[in-house]
Amino acid sequence: MGLILSAVTFGGVMKWIGFIAIALLCLMFMIVVHEFGHFVVGRLLGFKVDEFAVGFGPAIFKYTSKKSGVIFSLRCLPLGGFCGFHGENDEEDKPLTKDNFNFHKPWKRILVFIAGAGFNLLSAVVLCTIFFMAYGDMMPKVLMTYQFENGIEQNLQEGDLIIAVDGKSLYSTAVPNDLANRIQKHSDKMNVTIIRDGDKQDIVIYIGDYLSTNAENQVIESRGLGISITYEEYRFGFIESLGRSFVFIFKLFGTIFTSIGAVITGALGVGEAMGGTVTAIQQIAMVSQIGFRGVLFAVCALSANIAIMNLLPIPALDGAHVVFTTIEWVRGKPLNRKVENIIHTIGLICLFALAIILDVVHFVS
């Protein structure tokens, strides 16, 4: 009995270690993509890069490009990476050379700063498109039809898959209850696109009063399409999937900004709206149990999240660097580099502290 229990416990622990390892790799992927964005745009604009590293800590492998002099390294801690621009953190007392990061024009530096978030956003679009092509979106499928009280015959049949209303696609993943929201905008009928026996059809369906049964098997009067539904995966081609990825990310941005606004106004606690690195790893590890589908969806959402959060004007984040560089551009001269570096250092410490506090709060709750 004890041996069996120990084996089960050991197996469960090893499984969770695997999920956490997957989560760490996903997190590292998103951070490396971010840093790669800085690297690519920086090199295209003529910036000198000292090192591009995958991971942190002591280097396991190093390669120096003979053409550019960039050191590419693989480090032992799989917790992200970095792109080290030459002289990026130099202060004013050091003379600027043409290879120095701050020697370049402000608009070039701004492009480099936003490139990381841009690559995160691009990766979110690509991965989201792959997700909708591979797994599709959840479309409402007719399970049962009910008779309208006025005797009108509904044009829907059992097994019909509803994919669009009034020529506009349904977005179940991006917009929960999308079909119900569309129904509320019509009074008695609406045009829908359905898949019936593998064929796409445009039909008119009706809205009316009908009798149905609830969970307690009681007869109740309702108003709607006179159907009960479930949801089924429906895959899309490249163009439709690409469009859906933009809709999903746009809606996600709306949710993020709404949450930020709620935190600012006090309607939502910081701990309810945000989480630290450990929380992100925990979330990815949990969806890993679903399989590759869950991991892919989580990385899509988190990549878009990282893109937005990194552009917020918070010291140590790219958004704050953009603000400081824009001020320099307008003034025609930089702010005190030493003061700016101190501000970013304090911001970084505060962000680390906040991440730890949020992770502790999530763990306790």
Where are the regions that the model predicts?
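Hydrophobic alpha-helical segments of integral membrane proteins
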Residues: 52, 73-82, 86, 110, ...
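Small-residue-rich helix-interface/hinge motifs
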Residues: 3-6, 18-95, 302, 309-331
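Juxtamembrane boundary at the C-terminal end of a transmembrane helix
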Residues: 357-365
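Lipid-exposed faces of alpha-helical membrane segments in multi-pass integral membrane proteins
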Residues: 21, 25, 115, 119, ...
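Small-residue-enriched transmembrane helix starts and helix-helix packing motifs
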Residues: 293-307
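Membrane interface segments of multi-pass transport proteins and intramembrane proteases
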Residues: 61-65, 143-148, 326-342
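PDZ peptide-recognition modules
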Residues: 2-13, 93-107, 115, 119-269, ...
